[in-house]
Regions:
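Periplasmic-binding protein-like
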Residues: 44, 171-173, 317-340
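Conserved N-terminal structural module of periplasmic/extracytoplasmic solute-binding proteins
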Residues: 2-97, 112, 242, 288, ...
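Short, solvent-exposed loop/beta-turn-alpha elements that line the ligand-binding surface or hinge
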Residues: 109-119, 199-224, 272-274, 286-294, ...
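Hinge/lid segment of periplasmic solute-binding proteins
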Residues: 92-144, 155-158, 162-164, 189, ...
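Long, aromatic- and glycine/proline-rich binding clefts that accommodate carbohydrate-like moieties
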Residues: 121-127, 282, 331-383, 390, ...
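Extracytoplasmic/periplasmic solute-binding protein
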Residues: 130-138, 143, 162-215, 258
Length: 417
């Protein structure tokens, strides 16, 4: 129960420090806070910040690195004070609320040469909320299939049905075909399957809805996908994966318990450092009509609307977003890069990364936009994970779960129309 006190203390410290953000010598002091904190990541950010300070000797940057579990809460509390913060990490699920509260500055792009070097995806996500650049993404999270090449797979599965069949063949004794995610975040995987099974009828811009305005949960294809989701758990996955979250499903693969895993590119580094040596990657499986859908996770750097040094804050955001720095950050964190120049870098076009390039070049591997700006989004994240647990343990049926989700998102559509 001490977290709120720590957060308030952090905010108070920044408020007090913010009173002296300049100096008589003309030196400008910026305060910057990260969200997805880890020791190696913080070390890399400090290196990039040191390069910025070297190039701008009149600007000094203080980096605040809160613990990962409470970072977003602390950032929000600091933003509420509207003092003592200049640059911050903004995530895909915080940018909407931060901008709605007026905490984020609109970043200039027309006079910044680095804008034209950003990939089309980076430019699109920078202005995804309200059509205004409240952040510059530093990289993207997109799922791919990791699989063991020494477990009898001649070729990686290209459809969910093939994944199920391959997983059954791999499952024997204490080895299982698939790293299932039944715990927190598990509902996202069944939604991904349902999306693939709905195929071309799905509206990628509003990915919980079809082009005819019905929800993706209302169709016979949704029933097929959900039933297969349950079969993949029961027949190809470890029984305790009913409660697995991100760490457990990754560990299941790297420890040799499972032969397949679907996860983000940050796992590449984890697998490379593990004892697993015979593995590869492939684009995520498709549905019966040949389509695969997934959202792209992202985060980036933004400037506060109340910064006492807006020009310098923007300068730091732009520096971190330019090719050299952004590519270094993407490499250090196993992210899909934002710079066009990275496309010629061997790290992002060979080996485990090749699957991401293949997916980007496949018109039927479609990027979607989740309804994160709908009022019920946060509640659905909680409710849907609970429903998946009930589904996997036999407390709810496929029909009951889909009926509930269909009703929820039908109602949500009325609230935003």
């Amino acid at each position: 129960m001490r977290t709120p006190l720590i957060a308030v203390s952090t905010a108070a410290t920044l408020m007090l420090a913010g009173c002296g953000s300049g100096s008589s010598s003309g030196e400008v002091r910026l305060r910057m806070i990260e969200s997805l904190t880890s020791p190696e990541r913080t070390k890399l950010i400090k290196t990039l910040v040191a390069d910025f300070e070297k190039a701008n000797p009149k600007i000094k940057v203080e980096l605040i690195s809160p613990p990962l579990d409470s970072a977003d809460q602390k950032i929000t509390q600091i933003l509420q004070t509207k003092k003592g913060l200049d640059v911050l990490e903004v995530r895909d699920h915080t940018v909407k609320s931060f901008s709605n509260n007026g905490w984020l500055a609109e970043l200039p792009t027309t006079d910044w040469a680095g804008w034209s070097d950003l990939t089309e995806l980076a430019q699109k996500k920078a202005v995804e909320v309200g059509g205004k650049p409240y952040l510059i993404p530093y990289g993207f999270y997109e799922r791919t299939l990791f699989y063991r090449t020494d477990w009898g797979l001649a070729q990686p599965p290209t459809t969910w049905q093939e994944l199920y069949e391959a997983g059954k063949k791999m499952t024997s004794g204490d080895k299982f075909g698939y790293s299932f995610r039944g715990g927190k975040g598990g509902a996202d995987y069944v939604v991904q399957m349902i999306s693939a099974y709905n195929g071309e009828a799905l509206n990628p811009e509003k990915s919980f809805y079809l082009k005819d305005k019905r929800t993706i949960f209302s169709t016979p294809e949704a029933v097929q996908a959900t039933d297969l989701f349950v079969k993949i758990f029961k027949e190809t996955s470890p029984p305790d994966s009913v409660s697995w979250g991100y760490p457990e499903m990754v560990q299941g693969f790297t420890s040799g318990v499972t032969g397949m895993l679907i996860q983000d590119p940050e796992v590449i580094k984890t697998v490379e450092e593990s004892s697993v040596k015979t593995w590869s990657t492939a684009p995520i499986p498709k549905g019966p009509s040949g389509y695969a859908f997934q959202p792209v996770g992202y985060a980036g750097w933004g400037a506060t609307s109340f910064s006492e040094h807006p020009k310098e804050a923007v300068k730091l955001v732009q520096f971190l977003s330019e090719a050299k720095q952004s590519i270094a950050f993407a490499k250090g964190n196993s992210l899909i890069p934002i710079s066009k120049q990275a496309q010629s870098d061997p790290q992002f076009s060979q080996g485990a990364w090749k699957a991401y390039l293949q997916a980007q070049q496949d018109p039927k591997q479609v990027i979607t936009i989740r309804p994160v700006d709908y009022p019920g989004w946060s509640q659905f994240l909680v409710d849907s994970d609970r429903d998946v647990q009930a589904l996997l343990t036999g407390k709810k049926t496929t029909a009951e779960v889909l009926k509930s989700w269909d009703a929820f998102w039908t109602d949500q559509a009325k609230k935003v129309s």
